[in-house]
Amino acid sequence: MSAANPETPNSTISREASTQSSSAAASQGWVLPEGKIVPNTVFVGGIDARMDETEIGSCFGRYGSVKEVKIITNRTGVSKGYGFVSFVNDVDVQKIVGSQIHFHGKKLKLGPAIRKQKLCARHVQPRPLVVNPPPPPQFQNVWRNPNTETYLQPQITPNPVTQHVQAYSAYPHSPGQVITGCQLLVYNYQEYPTYPDSAFQVTTGYQLPVYNYQPFPAYPRSPFQVTAGYQLPVYNYQAFPAYPNSPFQVATGYQFPVYNYQPFPAYPSSPFQVTAGYQLPVYNYQAFPAYPNSPFQVATGYQFPVYNYQAFPAYPNSPVQVTTGYQLPVYNYQAFPAYPNSPVQVTTGYQLPVYNYQAFPAYPSSPFQVTTGYQLPVYNYQAFPAYPSSPFQVTTGYQLPVYNYQAFPAYPSSPFQVTTGYQLPVYNYQAFPAYPSSPFQVTTGYQLPVYNYQAFPAYPSSPFQVTTGYQLPVYNYQAFPAYPSSPFQVTTGYQLPVYNYQAFPAYPNSAVQVTTGYQFHVYNYQMPPQCPVGEQRRNLWTEAYKWWYLVCLIQRRD
């Protein structure tokens, strides 16, 4: 088999580099593309989200003085899973490539770094090599360098056939170079750029269809560190940064399905600055102006397939200011006024589609600490800032599908005091007045259809304390009255069909004490795992698919 003439312009490989790389290729089973091997530089694949450049540099320090470590990321700062390590002095790249390096329990994929000249960027004729190694996985990576040259990672092939390497160009208009070619199951992946003309820069994000759980790392350049958590099958996750120009800092996290995203700017004439971002499928977009007769001006933009939206302002006469916004499919929306005789004024509205709930941790660097939980299938979410004149700082916003929500009083030992609102589908709404003998006045409203809600305590070993809530379909919900030994008395409303009740006490080792009531029929209680792996991850895929299939059947039957 013949190789390209090494003297050919724009496809030069030095004889020495060619000899070394051919030897490495013979041992590893690589088919090398034409190009120039970058001296003292190693391609590193298999980098997961937990690895940072400092750790990788330390790992490779055994081979020589590390000059630079570059992890390739997309526009949002999320690692693409590979990068390059360059050394100050001459190193034996062939020896490094042939070594076995495991990092965080994961084997790294190593190879020589190959620079492809610009004039040959459209077509690369590989140098064939006949080998018969055990079939390794295939991978191909490209790194766009500022000098307009392209680095090509050699492609692994299990058979002695000629492979053609297609170079993918990075996006020229991106503030950071992005490598495409990542295939996400079922749906296409789209990255949306930040909006340079917006007062608030938003990077949207991830469409992770049907399958696995992926945790997203905190964003080191963000003034608010976010550790996100849960990606619920079929839909997407995206985290929004806090808004520095807003008098109330809010960091929210959302999970969006299938459709497009548009961020809306804050409204400067509003005493409470709100920037909401929503997902707009199929239907038309309508933005509703602020209400001039309201003491608090709110302008929101939402995506509502088929249904209408109304946002309600805060109530100035209430000692605890709460503004909630919800999206109501199929059914009519009614907002109930605050109760003037109640020391705590609450107006709630609700929206009920069909899916799951997810909670995000509080943000320690925020002037207003917020523990929020959101679940957004086909519909929308909006979070409102805390209100400084309230004795209890509250940011609420929930979207609870066909299932139920129950709110618990503030937790005295918790660094974050939370008063939450409620979700009422199909059935009638009843608001219960505050209880004068309670040190914390709560007006609650409940609607209890056919399914369950449960809240989980914070995790004491987590740097971010999280009180999460999850939704358990098929069975019934019931709320029980306050616990007499609790310093905060709460009386709730009830719907007690069919099944048994069990109340679980607060967890004494938890930084946030929670007394919850649950009804668990047939199914077991599970705390959500941290980063499931192996067989456990495969089981989660299977369970997610079964639940999704069940929901589809229920919708079809309805």
Curated annotation (Swiss-Prot):
Q: From which domain of life does this come?
A: Eukaryota
Residue ranges of domain RRM in the record: 40-115
Composition-biased stretches, type Low complexity, lie in 11-27
Q: Where in the cell is it found?
A: Cytoplasm; Nucleus
One GO MF term on file is: RNA binding
Q: Any idea where the DAZ domain is?
A: 167-190, 191-214, 215-238, 239-262, 263-286, 287-310, 311-334, 335-358, 359-382, 383-406, 407-430, 431-454, 455-478, 479-502, 503-526
Signal peptide region: none
Gene Ontology BP annotations = 3'-UTR-mediated mRNA stabilization; cell differentiation; positive regulation of translational initiation; single fertilization; spermatogenesis
The record's section on SUPFAM superfamilies has: RNA-binding domain, RBD
Gene Ontology cellular component annotations, sorted alphabetically: cytoplasm; nucleus; protein-containing complex
- Quote the biased-composition stretches of kind Polar residues, using this chain's numbering: 1-10
Q: Which Pfam family, giving just one, matches this sequence?
A: RRM_1
Q: Which UniProt keywords apply?
A: Cytoplasm, Developmental protein, Differentiation, Nucleus, Repeat, RNA-binding, Spermatogenesis
**Keyword Repeat annotated:** yes
Instruction: Check the record and name the InterPro entries matching this protein.
Output: DAZ_dom, DAZ_RRM_vert, Nucleotide-bd_a/b_plait_sf, RBD_domain_sf, RRM_dom
Residue segments, region Disordered: 1-27
According to UniProt, the tissues expressing it are described as:
Testis specific.
Major subcellular site = cytoplasm
Record: disease: Spermatogenic failure Y-linked 2: A disorder resulting in the absence (azoospermia) or reduction (oligozoospermia) of sperm in the semen, leading to male infertility.
State the protein's purpose. Answer: RNA-binding protein that plays an essential role in spermatogenesis. May act by binding to the 3'-UTR of mRNAs and regulating their translation.
Additional record remark: The DAZ proteins (DAZ, DAZ2, DAZ4 and DAZ4) are all encoded by a strongly repeated region of the Y chromosome, in two clusters each comprising an inverted pair of DAZ genes. They are very similar, which gives their indidual characterization difficult. Thus, most experiments do not discriminate between the different members. One can therefore suppose that reported interactions with a DAZ protein involve all the 4 proteins.
This protein's domain notes: The DAZ domains are essential and mediate the interaction with DAZAP1 and DAZAP2.
Quaternary structure, per UniProt, is:
Forms a heterodimer with BOLL and DAZL. Interacts with PUM2, DAZAP1, DAZAP2, DZIP1 and DZIP3.
The record's comment on protein family reads: Belongs to the RRM DAZ family.
Q: Give the protein's recorded name.
A: Deleted in azoospermia protein 2
Which species does the entry assign this protein to? Homo sapiens (Human)
